[in-house]
Each structure stands twice: as C-alpha cells, then as structure tokens.
Design a protein with these regions (language model features):
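Bacterial lipoprotein signal-peptidase II cleavage site
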Residues: 19-32, 41
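Hinge/lid segment of periplasmic solute-binding proteins
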Residues: 50-51, 119-172, 310-317, 386, ...
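Short, well-ordered beta-strand elements
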Residues: 54-66, 86-91, 114-115, 164, ...
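Extracytoplasmic "Venus flytrap"/periplasmic binding protein-like
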Residues: 78-149, 184-186, 279, 284-287, ...
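Extracytoplasmic/periplasmic substrate-recognition and gating elements
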Residues: 81, 87, 185, 260-262, ...
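A structural signal for short loop-to-beta-strand junctions that line the ligand-binding cleft
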Residues: 113-114, 119, 143-181, 214-217, ...
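Glycine-centered hinge/linker elements that transmit conformational signals in sensory
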Residues: 203-204, 239-270, 318
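Long, aromatic- and glycine/proline-rich binding clefts that accommodate carbohydrate-like moieties
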Residues: 316, 366-422, 426
Length: 451
C-alpha cells in the first residue's frame, strides 16, 4: 500500500511540477541548431585532445547551499567515477540572492560556468530573456533522451518552442512537525486533513510564551510563498491574478499568530537571517510549512548528530481551506542549463543528462530528496531511506492531490515576484496594514500585467 501511494505521489508531483516553466521571450538566444552542433563538435574535439595528453577537463557548476545539500557531492563523485578525465568544480553562490548573482555572473565578462542550476521560474525567465542559456533540443535529439519520463515538465518549460533547461529535482510543500513537542503537551499529532482553522487552533494549543521557555506552535520562513501561497490552493486563484484580495484571511491568520507569540517575529527573523532549518533544529517549533527539499538536510543532520532537538519528526499534508481537497499543495522544480559562454558544452550536456536521468535520480532519492523522474527503484529508495519517518501519516503525506506552482509561467514573472516580495515584507514588518499591502500588490502587479 505504501509503495502504491508513493508511486502515485511521485507521478502526480512531476506532472504538476512540469507547469513550472517559462513564458515566451523576445530576448531568447539566437543560437541555431547548426551553431549548437558545430559548437558541440568543437568542444568534443577539445575534450578528445585533452584525453590524449592526459589532462583533465574541469566542469564548473553553479549551486547553492552546498553544506546543506548532501546529494551534490554524491552526484559529482558518481559522475567523476564514470568520467575519470573530468573534474567537477562546484561554486556556491549562496541561496539568498542566487539567481541575481548568477545573472550577473553570466552577463558579465569572464564567466566560466559550464553548467548552472536554475532555482526558480523568474530566474529562468531572466536568463532566457538575456540570451545566456544554450538551447538543449539538438543535444536531446542526438542523445535520444525520452522527455516523457519527466511527465510533461519538459514541455511546460519551453520558450518559443525551445528547451533551455532540464529538471533533476522536484519538490512540493508539506507540514513538518516535532513529535516530542506534541507528546510533551499531550496533544494529538496533526492529521493529513486539517482546515486552516483547525491548524491555527492546533498551533495555538502548543504555544508557550513564557520567557526562556518559548515554544512556537508554527513557524513561517521569510519567503512570501510561506504565507501568500496558502491562497492559491483552491485552484481558483493564482499568484498572477493582479487582484490579491483573496490573500487577506491568510495574512490575518499569520499576523495574529505573530502578535500572539504563536510564531516568531518576521522582522527578527529577517534581521537575524535565521534559516528555517536552524529554527526547526532548535527544537522549540511544533509545526513548520516547508518543502520536501528539507528531507535530505534533516535526515543528514540528525544522522551526523548536528541536530539533536528535532530527531522525532514527521510530516503531514498541507492545511487547506474549507472545500479544498486535502493534499493540495505547492510545487517547484530545480533544473540544469548550459550557459552560451561554456567552452565544454558537449561534456556539460553529458553531466546534465546524468544528473537528470535514472542514475542521478537514484542518487538523489537515496538522500531522501525527490528527483524529477520516477521509477520503481526510485520509489523504493525514497520509502526506505534511513531516517525517513515510517508512520502511516508521514507516508500518506507524500500522496498529493492537486499541485500548484509557486510562480506560474509569465514573461514578467521576475517583475511580479519583486512587487509581491516588497508588499509581503511591508505587511509582515508592520510597515503597512494588510489592506494597504494588498492594495499595493493590486496596483503594482496590475500595472506590470498591463504593460
């Protein structure tokens, strides 16, 4: 039964996450298939020459949060073992401003990245618009890669008919919880079918505001998605609507929790730069909405003994509004691309093909993370990962129903993202009221959409 649930979950997740593409852009690369083939042949000749002289080729890969992502080094080690003439150099650009830093690197002079990680849709849109990513279609065709294994993801990230990235990680949001806090309070664990009202009441029942003994019933990271995207789970609204009145009840819930000490103060979190993993690791957070990308970090840090206050954890499905199907949640993919400036495009493609394929998927799954493709072996690896919670609710939480993108495809997604982030920050810090912040979103995003 567990295996069937996981299989269904992964298949559905990857279909929905496939929507995480990018819209058309007049600024896309003018590189033709012929140019790409010629460049690939030249790169292949260079690689062959290096092999004959015994020299190693270095592939430079941009990533973020190396220390918190255990599958990075495992992927690199496996690829280097299959390619002893290659060294993969990871460059950590940090998670906070990753896409901004990457765009600066790729549009500046002297960038020597061969493979770049794509973190989100707005960042992808920006890079495609700037013409700094290589079209992958000729590589895919010549390699015989079956794009159907991505369950529609590849088709959804095409720009003007061309594909500039290939996904290798697929993530969705769940509710993490610390069982020890519930046990100490004598409160039953959260379930896979909670309305927001039930969730809010549960968080309040676990909260302790005594100075020095604080227990937070809930925790929200400083990303706008941790609050705003509660409002899109009904399938009727998107974050591109241009009118955001539907967000008011969710902001009211979180602001009231913040005022009552149910969750930590946003401004304090922002100033201190406390990472969500650090907050949960302290052992005084009962529930935290976060993505499945946290699985691998949590499992690894507990295994190494770095996390000692949150070892008894579980997950359940996202809370939902009345009338919304349980298991409705948010989805996001992480992809790989080749910069047009790379001198090793053919080898970079081999690396991408490895990470995005079956072998890479099994390595990712072995750490508890969810890859972009699913097979029986991948499902077995996820379900049997040491440290992954084995209670029925945690397994069932992986069986999602409806998935919605954090940021849907749009040519101006980056501008919209900026406007929404600014308004979110103003609301959460108290710089403006909820009504004023929503009015700001309505005005600014509507103007962007009308351009």
């Amino acid at each position: 039964m567990k295996k069937r649930a996981l299989s269904f979950m992964l298949a559905f997740t990857m279909v929905a996450a496939g929507l995480a593409g990018c819209s058309s852009s007049s600024g896309s690369s003018d590189t033709t298939a012929a140019d790409t083939t010629a460049a690939g042949s030249e790169a292949a000749d260079t690689t062959a020459a290096e092999e004959s002289t015994g020299e190693k080729t270095t592939l430079k890969w941009s990533v973020w949060d190396i220390s918190a992502t255990p599958y990075y080094q495992l992927l690199v080690d496996a690829f280097e073992e299959k390619h002893p003439d290659v060294t993969v150099e990871m460059v950590d650009l940090g998670s906070t401003d990753y896409q901004t830093v990457l765009a600066t690197e790729l549009t500046g002079s002297g960038s020597d990245f061969d493979v770049v990680s794509i973190k989100d849709v707005p960042g992808y849109t920006t890079l495609v618009n700037k013409g700094v990513l290589e079209p992958l279609d000729s590589y895919i065709e010549s390699s015989g890669v079956d794009l159907t294994q991505y369950k529609g993801i590849a088709d959804q990230v095409r720009v003007d008919g061309q594909l500039y990235e290939l996904p290798y990680i697929n993530s969705f949001w769940v509710l993490f919880y610390n069982k020890d806090i519930f046990d100490a309070a004598g409160v039953e664990y959260p379930t896979n079918d909670m309305t927001f009202e039930e969730y809010d009441a549960l968080a309040r029942s676990l909260t302790v505001t005594t100075p020095g003994q604080e227990v937070y019933g809930a925790h929200y990271h400083t990303w706008r998605s941790a609050v705003q995207l509660f409002g899109v789970l009904d399938g009727e609204h998107t974050i591109l609507d241009g009118n955001y009145d539907f967000l008011k009840p969710y902001y009211e819930m979180v602001i009231n929790e913040q005022n009552d000490g149910v969750c930590q103060d946003y401004a304090t979190l922002k100033t201190s730069g406390l990472h969500y993993s650090g907050a949960f690791a302290q052992g005084n957070v009962a529930m935290m909405n976060q993505g499945t990308w946290f699985f691998s970090t949590l499992i690894e840090k507990i295994k190494t003994g770095e996390y000692t206050e949150c070892t008894n954890w579980g997950i359940v499905k996202y809370p939902h509004a009345e009338g919304v199907e349980p298991g409705s949640t948010l989805s996001q993919i992480t992809s790989l691309a080749i910069p047009t400036s790379s001198d090793n495009k053919d080898l970079a493609w081999e690396f991408i093909q490895f990470l995005s394929g079956e072998e890479g998927a099994e390595i990712v799954a072995s750490t508890g993370a969810i890859p972009a493709i699913m097979s029986d072996s991948v499902v077995d690896l996820i379900s049997s990962t040491e440290g992954f919670p084995q209670d029925e609710n945690s397994i069932e939480a992986l069986n999602t129903s409806n998935l919605y993108l954090e940021m849907p495809v749009h040519a101006k997604s980056s501008e919209i993202e900026t406007a929404l982030n600014e308004a979110h920050d103003s609301i959460m810090t108290g710089s403006c009221t909820i009504d004023e912040g929503i009015a700001q979103m309505n005005e600014q995003v509507s103007a962007i959409l009308a351009e």
